[in-house]
């Protein structure tokens, strides 16, 4: 298959007018590399195995071709997108809704931790696009609520995370339930052996696309470190919030208890702050994320796990309140800022016991850090 050269604008891709209108209203001007490469492959009906990092526009890369092919007259599932987390299910479903604004198809997010009833009713109405987590999808199949016999495409989004989280058996069961004659697309941040084996087993003559991580993840983020005693970290954070012109700030802590403790302290100091972690109900997390997404919150405090899949373009600053455990966690955290062509600042607190670990982290991360002196120590 001969691939077209990268498109400079969406107008250079062949996209249905209804979808072109929606993406123009969303402000999408130039397609990302993964969109340029993946959209023509999927439009041609080919299977796809794409290596692309989070934040590269991969959701639109598969949503656009799917929305073009879905038949809104047929009241049954035609496209299935399997994702590792509830937050990602909701995010992908929202993007389908936004891009498909002028199409007449319907999408539904299927995930655990909430009652079955609303999902059952949505499926009964004949939704065409189903986005969900493996366990709850299988539950609905077993209950007779979800029929996959009419699918023309299956997408495994963040396939490496699906396997890392132990969903391999459920994913295989789902794929065996799907029609043999179907299109299959896998998107993964890494080309680990397990993901490649899955792709080879359940796809046919797949086109392989590898997208290099965007340089903006490094170049557009200023890395700052601050030496601070553990007992002074709250005051240090307040000083940084005053010093920088911050839009929205994402603060990382290791533990749920640490998240709650910091939220309470900042709230008492009259900061517009909220927390998100795994002990909160799904509804509480969704409400908090929506407030942050809409700009109603200035500071969001989160654990690493709770912030996975968090994609908000206006996060101006990330603060590593607790030193990241390793370079991978560091990269994930700081990558929440400096997105969509914007610049960002990542501040890492280095406590009195953190110097050796920070030196190792800095060496592995391979990015320059600037030291900032706090006023509370510069007196």
Predicted segments, located by residue:
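Conserved helicase RecA-like core
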Residues: 2-379
């Amino acid at each position: 298959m001969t691939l077209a050269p990268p498109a400079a604008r969406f107008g250079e891709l062949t996209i249905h007018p209804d979808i072109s209108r929606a993406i123009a209203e969303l402000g999408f001007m130039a397609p990302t590399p993964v969109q340029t490469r993946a959209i023509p492959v999927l439009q041609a009906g080919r299977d796809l195995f794409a290596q692309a990092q989070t934040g590269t526009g991969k959701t639109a890369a598969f949503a656009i071709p799917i929305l073009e092919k879905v038949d809104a007259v047929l009241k049954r599932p035609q496209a299935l997108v399997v994702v590792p987390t509830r937050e990602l299910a909701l995010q992908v479903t929202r993007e389908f809704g936004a891009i498909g604004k002028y199409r007449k198809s319907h999408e539904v997010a299927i995930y655990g931790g909430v009652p079955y009833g609303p999902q059952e009713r949505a499926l009964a109405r004949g939704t065409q696009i189903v986005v969900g987590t493996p366990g709850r999808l299988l539950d609905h199949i077993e209950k007779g609520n979800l029929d996959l016999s009419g699918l023309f495409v299956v997408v495994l989004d963040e396939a490496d995370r699906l396997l890392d989280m132990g969903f391999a058996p459920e994913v295989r069961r789902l794929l065996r339930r799907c029609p043999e004659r179907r299109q299959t697309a896998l998107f993964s941040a890494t080309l680990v052996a397990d993901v490649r084996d899955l792709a080879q087993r359940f796809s046919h003559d797949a086109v392989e696309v590898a997208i290099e991580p965007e340089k903006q993840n490094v170049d557009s983020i200023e890395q700052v470190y601050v030496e601070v005693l553990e007992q002074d970290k709250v005051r240090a954070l307040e000083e940084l919030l005053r010093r920088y012109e911050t839009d929205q700030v994402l603060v990382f802590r290791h533990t749920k208890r640490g998240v709650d403790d910091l939220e309470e302290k900042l709230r008492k100091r009259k900061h517009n702050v909220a927390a998100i972690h795994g002990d909160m109900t799904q509804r509480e997390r969704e409400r908090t994320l929506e407030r942050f997404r809409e700009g109603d919150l200035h500071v969001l405090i989160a654990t690493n796990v709770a912030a996975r899949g968090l994609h908000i373009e206006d996060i101006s600053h990330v603060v590593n309140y607790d030193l990241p455990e390793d370079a991978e966690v560091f990269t994930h955290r700081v990558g929440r800022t400096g997105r969509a062509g914007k610049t960002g600042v990542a501040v890492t607190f280095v406590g009195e016991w953190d110097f050796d670990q920070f030196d190792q982290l800095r060496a592995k991360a391979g990015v320059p850090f600037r030291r900032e002196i706090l006023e509370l120590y510069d007196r």
